[in-house]
UniProtKB/Swiss-Prot annotation:
Coiled coil (residue ranges): none
Keyword terms: Ribonucleoprotein, Ribosomal protein, RNA-binding, rRNA-binding
Homology family: Belongs to the universal ribosomal protein uS8 family.
Organism: Erythrobacter litoralis (strain HTCC2594)
GO cellular component: ribonucleoprotein complex; ribosome
GO MF assignments: rRNA binding; structural constituent of ribosome
Top-level division of the source organism's lineage: Bacteria
Role, per record: One of the primary rRNA binding proteins, it binds directly to 16S rRNA central domain where it helps coordinate assembly of the platform of the 30S subunit.
Name of the gene encoding the protein in the UniProt record: rpsH
GO biological process entries: translation
Keyword ATP-binding annotated: no
UniProt keyword Transport, yes or no: no
Name of the molecule in the record: Small ribosomal subunit protein uS8
Disulphides: none
HAMAP family in alphabetical order: Ribosomal_uS8_B
């Protein structure tokens, strides 16, 4: 059966891995997922990621980050879903926890955090929120 929300699946794997105190989790590879992971790494929510091509299909190995035993990601949620897409202009991008978290946005200039999108004055599809 086909997966209807690949990005939501990856975010759920990250959430479940952190709740189980795993060092890393695997997720099927795609360009969108890699771009979202790049934003999470730049913002300091994960230690890193790498492509793992040892199996039949390419996968992304996501290195989870903890601070004093607590997960770096307290909350991760999909905003724009396959059944209801959410778009926002650069001026209307939502803030998460008064700026303590980030919103991940897919823009014509690539996948960016809300701060980067505001700086570059671009809007787009609001993919997820993280804090």
């Amino acid at each position: 059966m086909a997966m209807t929300d690949p990005l939501g699946d990856m975010l759920t794997r990250i959430r479940n891995g952190q709740q189980a105190k795993k060092d890393s989790v695997l997720s099927p590879a795609s360009k969108l997922r890699a771009n979202v992971l790049e934003v999470l790494q730049r913002e300091g929510y994960i230690r890193g990621y790498s492509e793992d091509a040892s199996g039949k299909h390419a996968a992304l190995r996501i290195e989870l980050k903890y601070f004093e035993g607590e997960p770096a990601i307290k909350h991760v949620a999909r905003v724009s879903k396959p059944g209801r897409r959410i778009y926002s202009g650069s001026k209307e991008l939502p803030t998460v926890r008064n700026g303590l978290g980030i919103t991940i946005v897919s823009t014509p200039k690539g996948v960016l955090s809300d701060n980067e999108a505001r700086t570059q004055n671009v809007g787009g599809e609001v993919l997820a929120e993280v804090f």
